A protein has these predicted regions:
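An acidic-aromatic
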Residues: 64-112, 182-183
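N-terminal leader/targeting segments and the immediate start of mature chains
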Residues: 17-59, 72-73, 206, 211-214
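Beta-turn initiation residues at beta-strand->coil junctions
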Residues: 52, 94-95, 173-176
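Gly/Pro-enriched, hydrophobic low-complexity segments
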Residues: 129-212
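Extracytoplasmic
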Residues: 41-43, 62-64, 71, 85, ...
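Flexible, surface-exposed loop/linker segments and immediately adjacent secondary-structure boundaries
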Residues: 105-139
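Bacterial Sec-dependent N-terminal signal peptides
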Residues: 1-27
Length: 214
């Protein structure tokens, strides 16, 4: 995730300063509860939808994918691409190009997607606000607004939707300074499903004609 004000009157800020501090504490507490809940899972499997929209530019793109996570390891299927992280290296398989890119954890830090960072990304670089609560498909979803501490950030703010019953992440919305809105929604979540011992093992012999880029 790369990419989080204007007050019309000082008196408005003063009036709500105390309430803001309280809701920020509540928001941080809720996020910590979610992080603890997710960290306790042995495995997670879920589908997700991803929507990128910019009405000014008349852009709307919708995609979906599936991910399996165990501790730091994960397997991601997205846009026809398979990405596997085995705890040491990341393997990105692109069937369309018959190409495989292999990077170490250190090399891959600054690009690509690391779903496990969803647990802790909020802990640094953000201020928190308690936002709206909605009922979605019968589930109470509480949104927390995350505002980047860095004024030069490309992100205006994030909205993290929390399922208040399961204490899980349901939706992540990112609003950029240029008006682009991206929405990631999680569905069909399965917890603690037993996995094969080699589920996150990459076998290059399965791709005999692929170009290996490492």
């Amino acid at each position: 995730m790369r990419k989080i004000y204007t007050l019309n009157a000082i008196i408005f800020f003063i009036s709500f300063q105390q309430l803001g501090a309280q809701t920020s504490t509540a928001a941080k507490k809720l996020l910590d509860e979610v992080s603890i809940t997710i960290a306790a899972y042995e495995t997670m499997i879920f589908d997700f939808s991803y929507v990128l929209e910019n009405r000014q530019e008349n852009i709307k793109q919708e995609t979906s994918g599936t991910i399996t996570v165990k501790n730091e390891k994960y397997k991601l299927m997205y846009l026809g691409v398979e990405q596997i992280y085995d705890g040491e290296k990341t393997y990105t398989v692109v069937p369309e190009n018959e190409e495989i890119t292999i990077t170490t954890a250190k090399e891959g830090e600054d690009f690509g997607i690391n779903p496990t960072k969803l647990l802790n990304f909020y802990k640094e670089g953000y201020d928190y606000q308690w936002d709206i609560k909605q009922t979605i498909f019968g589930r109470p979803i509480q949104f927390v607004r995350l505002l980047p501490s860095n004024e030069n950030d490309e992100v205006k703010y994030l909205l993290l939707g929390i399922d208040m019953i399961k204490k899980n992440i349901y939706r992540l919305i990112e609003i950029d300074m240029n008006g682009t809105r991206t929405t990631l929604t999680i569905s069909n979540q399965k917890i603690n499903t037993p996995l094969d011992k080699d589920h996150f093992t990459f076998d290059v012999s399965n791709y005999p004609d692929y170009y290996i880029n490492n």
